[in-house]
C-alpha cells in the first residue's frame, strides 16, 4: 500500500483539505475519497502527467473534478490541490509551483 500525504503551506494550511471541505456535492466528495483510496492501492484510474512531475487525476462527476498530485519517492504520493475543469490551467500552475517549492525545501540543509 502507498502512503498518501497532503501538501502543507508554510502557514499550516492544507490546500487540498480546504478544497475538499468546501465541496457541497456529497456524491462528488465520495468519488474523490474513493479515488484517493485507489491511489493508495496504486490504482489511480483516469490520470495523466501534467508537467514538471505533477499528475492529474480526473473524476467524471459534476464540473469535472481534478486532483493534482506528485510522487514523493517510490511509494508516497503528495496531494497538492483539488479543482475542476473550469480552472484547470490555473490549478496546474499552482500545483506545479507548490511541488517545486516542496522539492526546494526538501533540498535545503
Mark where each language-model region is.
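Enriched for short, Lys/Arg-rich terminal
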Residues: 1-9, 26-29, 44, 59-66, ...
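Short, solvent-exposed recognition patches
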Residues: 11-47
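Beta-strand-connecting loop/turn residues
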Residues: 12, 52-53, 74-75
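Acidic, low-complexity intrinsically disordered regions
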Residues: 15, 51, 94-95
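A residue-identity detector for tryptophan
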Residues: 19, 55, 98-99
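A short, surface-exposed loop/turn module that caps and links secondary-structure elements
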Residues: 34-59, 106-109
Amino acid at each position: 500500500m502507498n502512503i498518501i500525504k497532503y501538501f502543507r503551506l508554510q502557514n499550516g494550511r492544507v490546500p487540498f483539505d480546504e478544497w475538499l471541505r468546501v465541496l457541497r456535492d456529497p456524491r462528488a466528495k465520495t468519488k474523490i475519497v474513493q479515488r484517493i483510496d485507489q491511489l493508495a492501492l496504486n490504482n489511480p484510474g483516469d490520470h495523466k502527467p501534467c508537467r514538471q512531475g505533477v499528475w492529474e487525476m480526473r473524476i467524471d462527476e459534476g464540473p469535472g473534478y481534478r486532483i493534482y498530485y506528485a510522487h514523493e519517492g517510490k511509494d508516497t504520493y503528495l496531494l497538492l490541490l483539488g479543482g475542476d475543469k473550469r480552472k484547470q490551467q490555473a490549478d496546474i500552475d499552482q500545483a506545479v509551483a507548490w511541488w517545486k517549492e516542496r522539492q526546494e525545501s526538501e533540498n535545503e540543509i
